[in-house]
UniProtKB/Swiss-Prot annotation:
The keyword Hydrolase does not apply. GO terms for cellular component: cytoplasm; nucleus. One of its GO terms (molecular function) is ATP binding. It comes from Dictyostelium discoideum. This is Probable inactive serine/threonine-protein kinase DDB_G0274613.
Length: 831
């Protein structure tokens, strides 16, 4: 049905396109009675016809007279728009109906899926309830077994205590008898006869003791048979997937056999107690004999002495018998420990992977062959008989207990932010990497392979855990603490778990607080005030002083090694190159590695010269004072805090960065800017020429440069030489006395135009002395007068120096790493 049917022309009955509205001069207020619609063409023809025939103008329908008409364009436009909207409405209705049909179809599908999910959830809940019931039954059974073992152990201990008390009483009686026999000197002939009879009885007792030893040997063989049966049980585990029902019954029988074996050991202990009772009876018999001899003997000093020897021999044999009893008890405890290890296997299987290195190695070798489905079957069977027991260890934690929240680094240098539990307690886990250039392996993949398939570390691999040992043993407020060591079983990687988590480092703070104005080297005012710089440097010197008092050197001090809280309290990290000064530095393993060129800016000149001097490298590297090396690095950091930029940087890298910046400006700016950039490039080229001339003077004292690392070190050394007031003419910078490296006026000019305090300038010069023998020591810098007016300054040297009882220097050498792993990580790492 057309919704615009009522708009047809009353004359031609066609659709009205152009509306014509009639009007009458005597009806000016819209009170005309005619309400019909006319199109312009029809009404025009009607008026022309009536006018030509001189007829009155009137509506052909209602005959109402009118004087004329007007063409209503507004009504025509509204009609066109209404028709368009009507078509759109019809189209949208059709689309809406289609969408409703699709929605209903999707809704029906979702309802069907929801029904299926509810059925599946119900099935899972039923299965869960069954498993919970089975677990409850298993736990109750395990509890009963543990109570039974505990009661047997208590009874055994009580019997041993009673036997020991009786034995002590008998020994006292024997001593009393011996004293009585010393007083007896009569009836020598009769006592001789009695003594011979006693010797025969002692020989008989010796034979009984030998039989007892054979019985003990049989017990040892019996225990070995138990071990072989346990190994047979482990071999049977590898085929449990094909014969689940049969193996489940075998496990039940073997476990019961273990209980019977423990019961047999208890019976053996009782038999030993019976044997001990027999020996006590023999002692009572000897006591009676002694009384008879005391009554009848009239002498015989020599025979009495023989009797004393016999009594002493008897005491020795009794002690040996007691040792045999203790040995059997030890074997029993060994069997109980093996039973606990099997319990641990069950407990560990419920919480983490079967191949975890905290499980016993003999069990892991068998369990590594078992598939996941087989392991589920083993859990269901072993779990019925064995409970769980927390494996006591000092610092190792399971890797799955940590939730990784943020990842940083690459394959060989990974640092992750992690949390435990419900997200509380943030820590940092750091990858323990391989040592480049050692016989650990040619690639990291080889190390991972060895870590996954073998929990035993080679001697060279043990050094990888030097940083972990140091962070665990060091105790200072400004050093990160090692909380635990963990292992990712999926990749075989070891991680150090460190605390606390500090979100920022000094390099980030320097980047935040520096701004360059037009390349002029002027530093804008920042939130990092001079008092904040002073506080940071004091903490850094204090923690290095602590390390040096423990005869430990860091060897990698740089802004990224210094973590900062919001109140500028620091935490020192990156102990990968740290080492004891008692170490033999002639070994290549003990030499520091600086793979990142950003570290070159903080290397001391004597170390750079030792690297560049290839002929005397080994000799010079052994003569380096690494404590002075750390103090130079502190001076570089102090100077960078003042300038907000690196001063002893790689000139080649800086120039490349400047040229790249200029090229970018050329592409983005107008011709005027291009001219300015060309001028800057010319200036940079002039500076490069000057630097190259200085570098040639230094390079002439060494061999030719062969690699990019040496080129960068030459550039850093050249930068240091050009910055100081009076540089030596050759590369042996550490053999020459020099003037101050820092020009105070230059520092003050760049330091926001402020006056640098004299004490700060003196400390900078002392830290950045070219001669390491005259460079300030950590204990001197910690009490420098630059810090004396600050509230955190400690005036008493005894308060800063470590307590003598806390001297750790002998515990921080490389030879202690293996002992550290044995004591703290024995269930994770085998050494």
């Amino acid at each position: 049905m057309d919704p615009f049917e009522f708009l047809e022309c009353s004359i031609c009955s066609e659709e009205v396109i152009d509306f014509a509205a009639i009007f009458s001069s005597n009806k000016k207020f819209g009170d005309k009675a005619c309400k019909h619609n006319f199109c312009v063409s029809c009404l025009t023809y009607l008026m022309e016809y009536n006018t030509r025939n001189k007829k009155a103008l009137c509506c052909p329908i209602c005959r109402e007279e009118f004087d004329g008409f007007i063409q209503n364009k507004t009504s025509s436009d509204l009609l066109k728009q209404a028709r368009k909207l009507s078509s759109a409405q019809i189209f949208l209705k059709n689309e809406n109906s289609k969408l409703n049909e699709e929605i209903n179809l999707i809704k029906n599908e979702r309802e069907n899926e929801a029904i299926q999910y509810r059925d599946r959830i119900k099935q899972l809940e039923d299965s869960k309830s069954k498993q919970v019931q089975e677990s409850t039954n298993i736990k109750s059974r395990i509890k009963e077994m543990e109570n039974e073992i505990q009661s047997l152990e208590q009874a055994r201990l009580l019997d041993l205590q009673n036997n020991q008390s009786k034995f002590d009483t008998q020994q006292q009686q024997i001593l009393t008898l011996t004293q009585s026999y010393r007083e007896s000197q009569s009836n020598y002939n009769d006592s001789n006869l009695r003594a011979n009879e006693l010797n025969n009885q002692i020989q008989k007792l010796y034979r009984e003791i030998e039989g007892f030893k054979q019985h003990a040997q049989q017990q040892d063989n019996y225990i070995k048979d138990i071990d072989s049966e346990k190994q047979l049980l482990q071999q049977q585990l590898s085929t449990i997937e094909q014969s689940y029902d049969r193996k489940q019954s075998d496990l039940l029988n073997n476990t019961r056999l273990k209980d019977l074996q423990i019961a047999k050991l208890s019976d053996a202990n009782q038999q030993l107690g019976t044997s001990l009772s027999k020996i006590e009876a023999e002692c009572e018999h000897f006591k009676k004999l002694y009384k008879e001899i005391q009554e009848d003997a009239n002498g015989g000093y020599q025979k009495n002495k023989n009797l004393e020897s016999a009594i002493a021999s008897l005491n020795i044999e009794l002690s040996r018998s007691k040792s045999v009893i203790d040995s059997l008890n030890t074997n029993k405890r060994t069997l109980e420990k093996e039973l606990e290890e099997m319990k641990l296997l069950y407990q560990f299987g419920r919480g983490t992977s079967i191949s975890s290195s905290i499980a016993p190695p003999t069990i892991i070798n068998t369990a590594n062959k078992i598939t996941n489905s087989s392991y589920n079957l083993i859990n269901n069977s072993i779990g019925y008989f064995m409970g769980s027991k927390n494996y006591l260890n000092d610092i190792t934690k399971p890797y799955k207990g940590f939730k990784i929240e943020e990842k940083r680094g690459n394959k060989t240098s990974q640092i992750h932010k992690v949390s435990i539990g419900n997200g509380c307690g943030h820590f940092v886990i750091k990858l323990i990497p391989t040592v480049s250039g050692t016989n650990v392996g040619n690639s990291y993949s080889k190390f991972i392979y060895n870590s996954i398939y073998s929990s035993t570390l080679a001697e060279s691999e043990i050094l990888l855990f030097r940083e972990a040992m140091l962070l665990y043993k060091l105790n200072h407020n400004n050093i990160l603490k090692l909380e635990s060591i963990t292992k990712d079983e999926s990749s075989g990687k070891y991680y150090s778990v460190l605390s606390p988590f500090v979100p920022k480092d000094l390099e980030f703070i320097l980047a935040e607080n520096s701004q360059n104005f037009g390349g002029l080297g002027k530093i804008s005012p920042t939130t990092l005030t001079f008092s904040d710089i002073k506080y940071i440097v004091y903490q850094l010197i204090s923690v290095v002083h602590y390390l040096h008092t423990q005869d430990l050197v860091h060897r990698d001090l740089k802004p990224t090694s210094i973590l900062l809280f919001d109140d500028y309290q620091i935490k020192l990290c990156s102990f990968g190159n740290a080492i004891s000064v008692f170490t033999n530095f002639g070994n290549s393993i003990t030499q520091p590695t600086y793979s990142n060129p950003s570290s070159y800016s903080y290397l001391s000149p004597e170390y750079i010269c030792s690297v560049l001097d290839k002929e005397n490298h080994s000799k010079l590297s052994n003569e380096i004072d690494w404590k002075a090396f750390d103090m130079w690095s502190i001076g570089c950091i102090f100077l960078e805090l003042i300038y907000k930029k690196k001063l002893f940087n790689n000139l080649n890298l800086d120039n490349n960065n400047n040229n790249n910046n200029n090229n970018n400006n050329n592409n983005n700016n107008n011709n005027n800017n291009n001219n300015n950039n060309n001028n800057n490039n010319n200036n940079n080229n002039n500076n490069n020429n000057n630097n190259n001339n200085n570098n040639n003077n230094i390079e002439s004292n060494f061999n030719n440069v062969n690699n990019s690392q040496q080129q960068q070190l030459y550039s850093v050394l050249n930068n240091i030489s050009t910055y100081k007031e009076s540089a030596p003419k050759n590369g042996n910078l550490y053999f020459k006395e020099n003037h101050n490296i820092i020009i105070k006026s230059k520092v003050e000019r760049d330091f926001n135009g402020a006056n640098l305090p004299t004490d700060a300038y003196n400390l900078l010069c002392a830290l950045l002395s070219f001669n390491p023998t005259t460079r300030i020591k950590a204990n001197q810098a910690a009490f420098h007068k630059f810090f004396k007016d600050e509230p955190y300054y400690i005036h008493d040297s005894a308060s800063v120096s470590p307590n003598k009882l806390e001297d750790l220097s002998s515990l921080l050498t490389d030879r202690n790493i293996k002992q550290f792993l044995k004591e703290k990580c024995s269930n994770l790492i085998q050494v």
